[in-house]
Structure formats: C-alpha cells, structure tokens
Amino acid sequence: MSHDGKEEPGIAKKINSVDDIIIKCQCWVQKNDEERLAEILSINTRKAPPKFYVHYVNYNKRLDEWITTDRINLDKEVLYPKLKATDEDNKKQKKKKATNTSETPQDSLQDGVDGFSRENTDVMDLDNLNVQGIKDENISHEDEIKKLRTSGSMTQNPHEVARVRNLNRIIMGKYEIEPWYFSPYPIELTDEDFIYIDDFTLQYFGSKKQYERYRKKCTLRHPPGNEIYRDDYVSFFEIDGRKQRTWCRNLCLLSKLFLDHKTLYYDVDPFLFYCMTRRDELGHHLVGYFSKEKESADGYNVACILTLPQYQRMGYGKLLIEFSYELSKKENKVGSPEKPLSDLGLLSYRAYWSDTLITLLVEHQKEITIDEISSMTSMTTTDILHTAKTLNILRYYKGQHIIFLNEDILDRYNRLKAKKRRTIDPNRLIWKPPVFTASQLRFAW
C-alpha cells in the first residue's frame, strides 16, 4: 500500500524467513501490545541484526520507525506488491495520455493563475475558505508535493518528503528525543545509535566523547543574535541567516527532523530566524523558533515554525504564533503563515485565531468590521473569516454577512480567562522592522 492509498491490494503469501521480505511488501508487526499492518519502506543490513523501516498502514507518517525481525509476525501471510505494467504497456499509456492532452491545448490558458477562473475573482466564497492554500481536498500525495511553492521554505525535491528517517535518537541537553522524519545529516552519523546535539550551538556529534570535548571549549550560551524580547518566562533572539549561516543551517537540520514538507538548510540567507529560549544558570536553551522571509512576495509573516518536541504541549507554540503577529503589528502589516501548514501547525494556528477572535469580539462590545479586526490583530481577512466560520458565528443576514456571539462563545471566553495562560507583553518588545536594500536581499551579499 502506498501513502496515497491508490495502489491495489497485493498478493498474499506465506513465508518462513525474514529473508523473503522485500521493500513495499506488507506484514504484521508488533506495536504497543497489538499487531498492526505495516509496509516495508527500507531494509538495513549494514549491521547485524537486519532492520526494517516500516510505515503503519492508516497511521501518521511520524510513527514510521526502524524495527528488528523479532517484531515481525511470520505466522500471518505477507502481502507482496503486484508487478508493475511492462515497459510496452507504459509506452502505450504515455502515448494515449499525450494524445488526449494535445486535443485541448488551450485548456490551461482558459483559467487564471493557479487554476482560478479569471471571472469574479473579487468575490469571496465563504463556503470554500481555504486556509491551507490547497485547492482540492482529493489531491493525491504526489500532486500535493508538486504544487508546493518553489520559493520560501518549501522542499524543492519531491522525493525528499518520502525519504526514510535516517537518525534513531538524538540527545540534546538532558533530553533524549526520537526524530520523526528524514533530515540530511552527514551519512556517517546515520549508523550511530545516538546523535549528540549541542544545546546552544546546535552542532552535531556522533560520539559522547566528541561532544563533551567540544562542550568544554565552546563558550556560546545563547543564540548568536540580538535579544529583542525578555520577560520572566522566555526570551526571543533575532538571527540573520546571512550573518550566521552555520548556526541557522544547524537549526534547519534539527527542525527538519520534525517537519515533513519544509526544508531549507543551505540557502538560509533570505531568512530571519526568531528563536524563543528559556533561561537557567547554564544559559539560554532553545525552545522553538519561527523563520520569515526578509521580503515575502505573498505577505507571509512565518515561513517555518516549530516547538521542539521536548517542549510541546506546554503553551510555547501559541507564544511563538503570538510573537509573530506582534512583529506584524510593529510593521503595520497583516500576515499569515506559509501554506500548507503541518497538521500540528494548523491545529495551533486555529486555536490561536479562535482565541484571539473570541477575546476581541467579547471585550470590544461594539460594532466592528472585518477590516478593523484585521487591522487590530494583523490577521488576514481570509483567516478571520475562516475562523468565524469554524466557530459557527458567521451568518448571512439581510444581504450581508454578520458575526454574532452565542452562549457557547461566551462560555469559551470565560474558560480562556480562567486559564490565565502566558502571553507576550508588547511593551517588552525592543525591535524595529529591519530594512534591506535590493543588493542586500541578493544571495551571498
């Protein structure tokens, strides 16, 4: 079974040895006291015993992992993939497809950019608000990758998204973390059981001895940039990708372990990185970060955003999002994150947008327009309307759309206030929007 779910069921066969297991076959694997059907994506025989990289069918890709042979149930049949069509059949299929395409050469020119009709482009379809920027919900995995932006922080190699996770465990400070995805660390590190990543420089090592020797000599105790925000809880540093290429590339390599579609680890020059840290007696420990393009043609205020796994589910994600909008307010701009968001990223943004909109509407207590909400929050009108529709507070009344507050919204507002979650204090932000000339925005300036 492929990730897009289009491949037909395979051929069931009983086997006696794991030597008969091949890539793309499916077998039953022990996982958390239950058996799950898993697809073999890769086989590693460089070290004994052999290991198999598996994707659990109908489960999230971040659960993919390396397993040993003892977890594979050979008592059940293995599904082998069906043989692909012969080369002659493929040629006929391609020829037929080319003929069909040539019959309507003007089809692609009938529509506007990105497939939108050139007519009625000023009309907003409130039933089809697309906060993810993906046109078709039925789009396949391969088509989705092809449609990703080729600028910003999107991966530009479609095969890269499907690569096998190459690191087993990383040790960062006092935390041991299991990566989720592939990241292009040096190949000599991929056979190590643990990779050591320095808490402050993000430099990586294949052995504990190398790491400890490096740590004794290194004096850096915070991200190598300007501290632009500090309160009793967190600090924020601004780092220019051009001025701190090595550190920013190390950051991108680390974040790629936990982000699937996003990848930028060589060309960091066009980006600014805003890193959130927690302080202790040792220094500033990285909690999460977001990056943004120095000049975004699409008006994005965030390119990549990540809270490190050891700090997730603690409220740091909302602080990162809130801080990105505080920067947009300082710039007197509206902004939105680069699309598509990861599943966790979309959940975090939806929660932030909902909380922000509910708080504003309840506390404002006067009539207010969508444009005024956008100006006060720096959220785009599309994100505001999407959030209002999700909250079910958008209604069509007497020829216009209105937002109304119901009891559920008021109850949610009261619960928000009772939580007393931490927020960003705009008065503690010491920052002016950086200005770059055309020559400064060019690569290798």
From Swiss-Prot:
<dbReference type="InterPro" id="IPR050603">
    <property type="entry name" value="MYST_HAT"/>
</dbReference>
<dbReference type="GO" id="GO:0010485">
    <property type="term" value="F:histone H4 acetyltransferase activity"/>
</dbReference>
<dbReference type="GO" id="GO:0006281">
    <property type="term" value="P:DNA repair"/>
</dbReference>
<dbReference type="InterPro" id="IPR025995">
    <property type="entry name" value="Tudor-knot"/>
</dbReference>
<feature type="binding site">
    <location>
        <begin position="312"/>
        <end position="318"/>
    </location>
    <ligand>
        <name>acetyl-CoA</name>
    </ligand>
</feature>
<keyword id="KW-0234">DNA repair</keyword>
<dbReference type="GO" id="GO:0035267">
    <property type="term" value="C:NuA4 histone acetyltransferase complex"/>
</dbReference>
<dbReference type="InterPro" id="IPR036388">
    <property type="entry name" value="WH-like_DNA-bd_sf"/>
</dbReference>
<dbReference type="GO" id="GO:0032968">
    <property type="term" value="P:positive regulation of transcription elongation by RNA polymerase II"/>
</dbReference>
<feature type="short sequence motif" description="ESA1-RPD3 motif">
    <location>
        <begin position="245"/>
        <end position="266"/>
    </location>
</feature>
<feature type="modified residue" description="N6-acetyllysine; by autocatalysis">
    <location>
        <position position="262"/>
    </location>
</feature>
<dbReference type="GO" id="GO:0005634">
    <property type="term" value="C:nucleus"/>
</dbReference>
<comment type="similarity">
    <text>Belongs to the MYST (SAS/MOZ) family.</text>
</comment>
<dbReference type="GO" id="GO:0061733">
    <property type="term" value="F:protein-lysine-acetyltransferase activity"/>
</dbReference>
<dbReference type="Pfam" id="PF01853">
    <property type="entry name" value="MOZ_SAS"/>
</dbReference>
<dbReference type="InterPro" id="IPR040706">
    <property type="entry name" value="Zf-MYST"/>
</dbReference>
<dbReference type="GO" id="GO:0140068">
    <property type="term" value="F:histone crotonyltransferase activity"/>
</dbReference>
<dbReference type="GO" id="GO:0000183">
    <property type="term" value="P:rDNA heterochromatin formation"/>
</dbReference>
<dbReference type="GO" id="GO:0004402">
    <property type="term" value="F:histone acetyltransferase activity"/>
</dbReference>
<feature type="domain" description="MYST-type HAT">
    <location>
        <begin position="162"/>
        <end position="433"/>
    </location>
</feature>
<dbReference type="GO" id="GO:0006357">
    <property type="term" value="P:regulation of transcription by RNA polymerase II"/>
</dbReference>
<dbReference type="InterPro" id="IPR016197">
    <property type="entry name" value="Chromo-like_dom_sf"/>
</dbReference>
<dbReference type="Pfam" id="PF11717">
    <property type="entry name" value="Tudor-knot"/>
</dbReference>
<dbReference type="GO" id="GO:0106226">
    <property type="term" value="F:peptide 2-hydroxyisobutyryltransferase activity"/>
</dbReference>
<dbReference type="GO" id="GO:0006351">
    <property type="term" value="P:DNA-templated transcription"/>
</dbReference>
<keyword id="KW-0804">Transcription</keyword>
<dbReference type="InterPro" id="IPR016181">
    <property type="entry name" value="Acyl_CoA_acyltransferase"/>
</dbReference>
<keyword id="KW-0010">Activator</keyword>
<comment type="function">
    <text>Catalytic component of the NuA4 histone acetyltransferase (HAT), a multiprotein complex involved in epigenetic transcriptional activation of selected genes principally by acetylation of nucleosomal histones H4, H3, H2B, H2A and H2A variant H2A.Z. Acetylates histone H4 to form H4K5ac, H4K8ac, H4K12ac and H4K16ac, histone H3 to form H3K14ac, histone H2B to form H2BK16ac, histone H2A to form H2AK4ac and H2AK7ac, and histone variant H2A.Z to form H2A.ZK14ac. Acetylation of histones gives a specific tag for epigenetic transcription initiation and elongation.</text>
</comment>
<keyword id="KW-0597">Phosphoprotein</keyword>
<keyword id="KW-0156">Chromatin regulator</keyword>
<keyword id="KW-0808">Transferase</keyword>
<feature type="binding site">
    <location>
        <position position="342"/>
    </location>
    <ligand>
        <name>acetyl-CoA</name>
    </ligand>
</feature>
<dbReference type="InterPro" id="IPR000953">
    <property type="entry name" value="Chromo/chromo_shadow_dom"/>
</dbReference>
<keyword id="KW-0007">Acetylation</keyword>
<keyword id="KW-0805">Transcription regulation</keyword>
<protein>
    <recommendedName>
        <fullName>Histone acetyltransferase ESA1</fullName>
        <ecNumber>2.3.1.48</ecNumber>
        <ecNumber>2.3.1.-</ecNumber>
    </recommendedName>
</protein>
<feature type="region of interest" description="Disordered">
    <location>
        <begin position="88"/>
        <end position="114"/>
    </location>
</feature>
<dbReference type="GO" id="GO:0051726">
    <property type="term" value="P:regulation of cell cycle"/>
</dbReference>
<feature type="domain" description="Tudor-knot">
    <location>
        <begin position="22"/>
        <end position="74"/>
    </location>
</feature>
<dbReference type="GO" id="GO:0000786">
    <property type="term" value="C:nucleosome"/>
</dbReference>
<feature type="active site" description="Proton donor/acceptor">
    <location>
        <position position="338"/>
    </location>
</feature>
